Amino acid sequence: RSYAQSNRLAHLLRDISVLTRMEEAPNMIETEPVNLTTMMRNILNEVTLELEEKQITAHNMLPEGLTIQGNSSLLYSIFRNLTDNAIAYAGTHISITIRCFREDERFYYFSFSDTGVGVGPEHLSRLFERFYRVDKGRSRKLGGTGLGLAIVKNAVILHGGTIFAKNTPGGGLEFIFTLSKE
């Protein structure tokens, strides 16, 4: 039990540190070309055991070689936190789909969706608040810090984008977000 609590505290400190860095020095963030397709493939490889345990099927539908100019650490945080959330909260025997559904001269448009349980409509507007939890008891048991989606939102904003969440008609949750090409 003490190991679990110290582990949770370590995750909390890490998440607070990431948020603080984003807020205090947004202009100090270094950028480089980042291949999002490869990054997402690597993330799915990292969580293979969790996916298998919950019988979750993941579909990385990002086009081969999709590369943007960005901060690799923050971009990783976006895709990893969305993946971790789907695994932790969407349920078992579901699927996760990541795709880039549109591109224009300035942005790539992404959808990160699952076929899980979704969330009550009253929670949708608050999902990105720090420490907000839809189900406080379950979140604590699963080890979440309540900062993952706040990190996602801030990282998306620092990459010139926007993000929102919606329930899907067949059940599940979908995050729609944009990332600037530059």
Locations of regions flagged by a protein language model:
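Short alpha-helical segment of the dimerization/phosphotransfer core of two-component systems
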Residues: 4-9
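Conserved catalytic submotifs in the C-terminal HATPase_c
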Residues: 30-33, 52, 57-67, 103
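Short helix-loop "hinge" at the ATP-lid/N-box region of the Bergerat-fold HATPase_c
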Residues: 86-87
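Conserved glycine-rich
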Residues: 92, 160-161
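Short beta-strand/loop element within the Bergerat-fold HATPase_c
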Residues: 93-106
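Acidic ATP/Mg2+-coordinating residue in the GHKL
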Residues: 114
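Short conserved segment of the HATPase_c
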Residues: 119-133
